[in-house]
Amino acid sequence: MEEIVKFLKEAETYYLATVEGDQPRVRPFGTAHIFEGKLYIQTGKKKDVSKQLHANPKAELCAFKGGEWIRVAGELLEDDRIEARESMLDAYPALKKMYAADDGNTEVFYFKNGVATISSFTHEPKVINF
Protein backbone atom coordinates (compact mmCIF):
# COMPACT_ATOMS: atom_id res chain seq x y z
CA MET A 1 0.00 0.00 0.00
CA GLU A 2 2.97 2.29 0.60
CA GLU A 3 3.74 2.07 -3.14
CA ILE A 4 0.23 3.30 -3.94
CA VAL A 5 0.44 6.29 -1.59
CA LYS A 6 3.96 7.13 -2.79
CA PHE A 7 2.73 7.20 -6.40
CA LEU A 8 -0.27 9.39 -5.54
CA LYS A 9 1.81 11.84 -3.50
CA GLU A 10 4.45 12.12 -6.22
CA ALA A 11 1.73 12.71 -8.83
CA GLU A 12 0.33 15.40 -6.48
CA THR A 13 -3.12 15.36 -8.12
CA TYR A 14 -5.35 12.41 -8.86
CA TYR A 15 -8.86 12.29 -10.27
CA LEU A 16 -11.61 10.61 -8.27
CA ALA A 17 -14.61 9.20 -10.14
CA THR A 18 -17.96 8.59 -8.46
CA VAL A 19 -21.49 8.12 -9.74
CA GLU A 20 -24.54 10.33 -9.28
CA GLY A 21 -27.53 8.34 -10.48
CA ASP A 22 -26.44 7.21 -13.94
CA GLN A 23 -24.00 10.11 -14.44
CA PRO A 24 -20.26 9.69 -13.79
CA ARG A 25 -18.63 12.54 -11.84
CA VAL A 26 -14.88 13.21 -11.75
CA ARG A 27 -12.91 15.79 -9.81
CA PRO A 28 -9.29 16.44 -8.75
CA PHE A 29 -8.13 15.37 -5.29
CA GLY A 30 -4.82 15.47 -3.50
CA THR A 31 -5.08 13.60 -0.19
CA ALA A 32 -3.78 10.05 0.18
CA HIS A 33 -2.93 8.79 3.65
CA ILE A 34 -2.38 5.47 5.39
CA PHE A 35 -4.07 5.14 8.78
CA GLU A 36 -4.27 1.83 10.63
CA GLY A 37 -3.16 0.00 7.49
CA LYS A 38 -5.88 1.44 5.24
CA LEU A 39 -5.72 3.95 2.37
CA TYR A 40 -7.70 7.10 3.22
CA ILE A 41 -8.85 10.20 1.35
CA GLN A 42 -10.48 13.35 2.75
CA THR A 43 -13.34 15.62 1.73
CA GLY A 44 -16.08 17.75 3.26
CA LYS A 45 -19.55 16.46 4.12
CA LYS A 46 -21.08 19.48 2.38
CA LYS A 47 -19.61 18.48 -0.99
CA ASP A 48 -21.45 16.51 -3.67
CA VAL A 49 -18.69 13.88 -3.67
CA SER A 50 -19.61 13.01 -0.08
CA LYS A 51 -23.27 12.56 -0.95
CA GLN A 52 -22.33 10.45 -3.99
CA LEU A 53 -20.06 8.14 -1.97
CA HIS A 54 -22.73 7.63 0.69
CA ALA A 55 -25.27 6.72 -2.00
CA ASN A 56 -22.84 4.45 -3.90
CA PRO A 57 -19.43 3.77 -2.34
CA LYS A 58 -17.93 2.27 -5.50
CA ALA A 59 -15.29 4.65 -6.80
CA GLU A 60 -12.10 4.77 -8.82
CA LEU A 61 -9.20 7.18 -8.92
CA CYS A 62 -6.51 7.73 -11.51
CA ALA A 63 -3.18 9.59 -11.53
CA PHE A 64 -0.34 9.99 -14.03
CA LYS A 65 3.36 10.68 -13.48
CA GLY A 66 6.55 10.06 -15.40
CA GLY A 67 5.05 7.89 -18.12
CA GLU A 68 3.09 5.67 -15.72
CA TRP A 69 -0.46 5.82 -14.46
CA ILE A 70 -2.25 4.26 -11.54
CA ARG A 71 -5.88 3.31 -11.22
CA VAL A 72 -7.27 2.48 -7.79
CA ALA A 73 -10.75 0.96 -7.59
CA GLY A 74 -12.83 -0.18 -4.65
CA GLU A 75 -15.42 0.96 -2.17
CA LEU A 76 -14.82 4.17 -0.23
CA LEU A 77 -16.36 3.89 3.23
CA GLU A 78 -16.60 6.66 5.80
CA ASP A 79 -14.59 6.36 9.02
CA ASP A 80 -16.40 8.64 11.45
CA ARG A 81 -13.78 8.42 14.21
CA ILE A 82 -12.14 11.68 15.22
CA GLU A 83 -8.78 9.86 15.37
CA ALA A 84 -8.98 9.11 11.65
CA ARG A 85 -9.82 12.73 10.83
CA GLU A 86 -7.03 14.01 13.10
CA SER A 87 -4.51 11.68 11.46
CA MET A 88 -5.44 12.97 8.00
CA LEU A 89 -5.24 16.61 9.05
CA ASP A 90 -1.88 16.01 10.75
CA ALA A 91 -0.59 14.51 7.49
CA TYR A 92 -1.92 17.51 5.50
CA PRO A 93 -1.51 20.55 7.79
CA ALA A 94 -2.52 22.99 5.02
CA LEU A 95 -6.05 21.54 5.26
CA LYS A 96 -6.33 22.89 8.80
CA LYS A 97 -7.00 26.32 7.28
CA MET A 98 -10.34 24.97 6.00
CA TYR A 99 -11.08 21.93 8.14
CA ALA A 100 -10.93 20.75 11.75
CA ALA A 101 -11.39 17.20 13.01
CA ASP A 102 -14.39 18.25 15.11
CA ASP A 103 -16.02 20.79 12.74
CA GLY A 104 -18.88 18.52 11.66
CA ASN A 105 -17.78 18.85 8.03
CA THR A 106 -14.42 17.05 7.76
CA GLU A 107 -14.89 13.55 6.45
CA VAL A 108 -12.46 10.73 5.70
CA PHE A 109 -13.09 7.62 3.64
CA TYR A 110 -11.00 4.46 3.37
CA PHE A 111 -10.75 1.95 0.56
CA LYS A 112 -12.31 -1.47 1.07
CA ASN A 113 -11.67 -4.28 -1.44
CA GLY A 114 -9.12 -2.06 -3.16
CA VAL A 115 -7.32 -2.96 -6.37
CA ALA A 116 -4.55 -0.72 -7.69
CA THR A 117 -3.11 -1.16 -11.18
CA ILE A 118 0.10 0.62 -12.17
CA SER A 119 0.52 0.72 -15.96
CA SER A 120 2.69 2.18 -18.70
CA PHE A 121 3.28 1.70 -22.40
CA THR A 122 6.60 -0.04 -21.68
CA HIS A 123 5.85 -2.73 -19.08
CA GLU A 124 3.16 -5.12 -17.99
CA PRO A 125 0.64 -3.75 -15.48
CA LYS A 126 1.36 -4.32 -11.80
CA VAL A 127 -1.72 -5.19 -9.75
CA ILE A 128 -1.86 -4.59 -5.99
CA ASN A 129 -4.82 -5.94 -4.03
CA PHE A 130 -5.38 -4.37 -0.64
Show which residues each predicted segment covers.
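General beta-strand recognition
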Residues: 15, 39-40, 60, 71, ...
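A short, Trp-centered hydrophobic/proline-enriched beta-strand micro-motif
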Residues: 6-20, 59-61
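A short mixed-secondary-structure module that forms the rim of ligand-binding clefts
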Residues: 32-67
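Hydrophobic/aromatic beta-strand elements that line small-molecule binding cavities or substrate pockets
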Residues: 29-32, 74-76
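Charged, gly/pro-rich active-site loop segments
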Residues: 71-130
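Absolute protein N-terminus
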Residues: 1-3
